[in-house]
Each structure stands twice: as C-alpha cells, then as structure tokens.
Design a protein with these regions (language model features):
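Beta-alpha junction/loop-to-helix N-cap segments that form part of ligand/metal-binding clefts
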Residues: 28-31, 56-62, 74-146, 211-215, ...
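Extracytoplasmic "Venus flytrap"
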Residues: 35-63, 87-94, 116-117, 182-191, ...
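Periplasmic-binding protein-like
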Residues: 103-116, 136-138, 178-183, 229-239, ...
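Hydrophobic alpha-helical
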Residues: 118-129, 220, 232-252
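An alpha-beta-alpha
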Residues: 152-213, 232, 326
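Segments of small-molecule ligand-sensing domains
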Residues: 307-316, 327-347
Length: 347
C-alpha cells in the first residue's frame, strides 16, 4: 500500500488470533444439524466474491482458505481433512440466503464462514439456524445482529464501538472541534456508525450530509462543505464510495483529515482515491500490517504474503481467525449442533 496514505488508526492493536466469538443471546433450532463425516469435515464459505463489495469477500476467501490449508497440512481436525464448499453470494442479500440453503441442505456442511457484511449475514442466518448449522461472520458489525440467534457468531467489533472510537480519535488525536458528517444513507452499517458518533462526539457537527451507495458524483455536497469551517470530515461508508469522495475532495482543495470505519480497509480504497490523493486519511482496523504484532499474527502475515504475494487486509485476517475458531470448535464434535455448542463456549 502506498505510504502517502496515512494508514489506519488501530482500534485494536492486532487481530486476536483464536479469540472468542461475538455475543450469543437466546434462540434455538429444532433441527438435529448435519453430521460430521467419517473422513472429512465440510465447511461452507459464503462470501461476496463478486459484486459491489467483492473486495471484502475475496479477501476473506483468501484468509479462510489459507487457514484451511494450514490446518489440513498439520493433520486436520481429529485426523480429518477440512473439505471446503466455496460459494459466491455476489454481494446480494437474497443470494446469501440462497447460498446458505444450498450449503446446509445440498452440501451438508457442518459450519459456515461468511458472509462478510451485516446485511448478507442477517439474510443468511435464518436458513442456517433452521438446519442447525452454525454460521460465523468474520466482519459483520451491526449492533444487535446476534440477539436471539444461537447459531450466529461474529468475529469483530460492532458499529457502535466504531462510532465511539472515531469520536474519541478525532477529539483527542486530531483535536477536531468541528466536523462534517457525510454518511451513506443506504447502509445500516454506515448509519449505525453515524448514530454512535453523534451520540459520543462532544464537538460541533457543522454539516450532516448523506449520499447513497452507488453514487459517483459527490461534488455538490463537497462544495457545500468547502464553505464551512471544520476540522475533519467523518465518512461512515464503504470503500466503493469513500474512495471516490476522497478523490473528489482532494481535487477540490479540501485537505482536512477524512476519517472512517473499517469499510475503508483495503487496497481498493486507495485505488478509488488514487495514491497521490489518499493522504491524511484515518480509519478503524482490527488488524494492521504496520504495527508490532504477536508471534501468531506474524506467522499469519508471513504465510499470507508467501501464498498470495500481497498484504492481507483486516478482512483476510478476521476470516483466517474465524476458520481457526470453527476448527477448534469441531474437535471431538459429532455434528453441527455440537460445533455450535463449542463455539458458544469459546473464551
């Protein structure tokens, strides 16, 4: 990644490899679940490998596959090799639900890793629960997503956490007394971060503007912002629009810090913004390649670089972590229900 880009402020120093899953509330399945096969353990991948947010899904697929390869090379789980059934949900919520049904009823997987986004995860979980198969999303951040869902696990922080961290960072580190809030109004993810930011920020929000996913021309809103007195722009949203916003803002001479959530994460954001304009940018990341990491995280970094000849994003790291969580929970398990129970006990 080009170093002109002011890399992430890291809310968590590094991904906690083999960390605990997200909170699990009430709710249950009447299904017995899928049995673990005699010679293999089937795990389904349900990732956004094409479509609007393919950068997230393809990164997660790579991280997840790396974990599978390492586990299998080390002898598998209880001597059984992991068999991956990899499906593309095309960045569509309906397809994520359909893929889940296929994985649990046709492929008979014992666990699912993915989707990446909150919307797709919310669409997928009902079909997984009905079949008694646990689903872990490496990166779904929507608050309350696990409420009432015994079969859903989350591998990252929530939107409300991100909004508070952004507020703290712009106030304490950037000394921003006045900000502009520019939110993707079509995204529950973005709206969740914006809501938490508004509640936590003690300074003045001098403008509260919105855009919609798929927009490409942001000059009208940016022109309005340019006439304001502010110290930073907060952009809750995904890289697909945020990168273009950075590009156009810098092209108009707006050089104030631009701050976002984990949706900025990845090389694709820099490609959208262009390297020469992607400066003075800050975003949250659960993993960073530029800070000191643990021995386990370094082993992941080295292996990922060797396999793919590129830097891993936080999405790759979280998916790698998620597969290890599933593998650990599958030890000694006879069916998907027992894998779910073991995931729920993970600390």
């Amino acid at each position: 990644m080009k170093k002109k880009f002011a890399l992430s402020f890291v809310a968590l120093a590094s991904v906690a490899l083999l960390a605990a899953c997200g909170e699990v509330k009430s709710g249950a399945s009447n299904a017995a679940g899928n049995s673990v096969e005699e010679k293999t353990i089937k795990i389904g991948f349900n990732f956004e490998e094409t479509g609007a947010v393919a950068a997230y899904g393809t990164s997660e697929q790579k991280g997840a596959q790396l974990a599978v390869d390492e586990i299998n090379a080390a002898g598998g789980i209880d001597g059984k090799q992991i068999e991956v059934v990899d499906k593309d949900n095309k960045s569509e919520t309906a397809e994520a639900a359909s893929v889940t049904t296929n994985l649990v009823t046709q492929s008979k997987v014992s666990a699912i890793v993915g989707p990446a986004t909150s919307g797709a995860t919310a669409a997928a979980v009902a079909n997984a629960t009905k079949a008694g198969v646990p689903l872990i999303s490496p990166s779904a951040t929507q608050d309350g997503l696990t409420k009432g869902q015994d079969y859903l696990f989350i591998g990252t922080f929530q939107d409300s956490f991100q909004g508070k961290i952004i507020s703290n960072y712009v106030s304490d580190k950037l000394q921003a007394k006045k900000v502009v809030l520019y939110t993707d109004n079509a995204s529950d993810y973005a709206k969740g971060i914006a809501k938490a930011f508004r509640e936590a920020y003690k300074g003045e929000i001098v403008a509260d503007e919105t855009f919609v996913a798929g927009d490409t021309d942001f000059q009208a809103a940016l022109t309005k912002m340019k006439g304001k007195d502010f110290d930073a722009i907060i952009v809750p949203g995904y890289y697909t629009e945020a990168g273009k916003i950075v590009n156009q803002a810098r092209g108009m001479g707006i050089d104030k810090p631009i701050v976002g959530g984990d949706g900025f994460n990845g090389e694709e954001f820099v490609q959208q913004a262009t390297a020469e304009k992607a400066s003075n940018i800050y975003f949250i990341s659960g993993f960073s390649t530029t800070v000191e990491v643990s021995a386990k995280a370094k082993a992941f970094l080295d292996a990922y670089r060797a396999k793919y000849n590129e830097e891993p994003s936080t999405f790759a790291a979280l998916a790698y972590d998620s597969v290890h969580l599933v593998a650990n929970a599958a030890k000694g398990a006879k069916n998907s229900g027992e894998i779910k129970d073991n995931l729920a006990k993970t600390k």
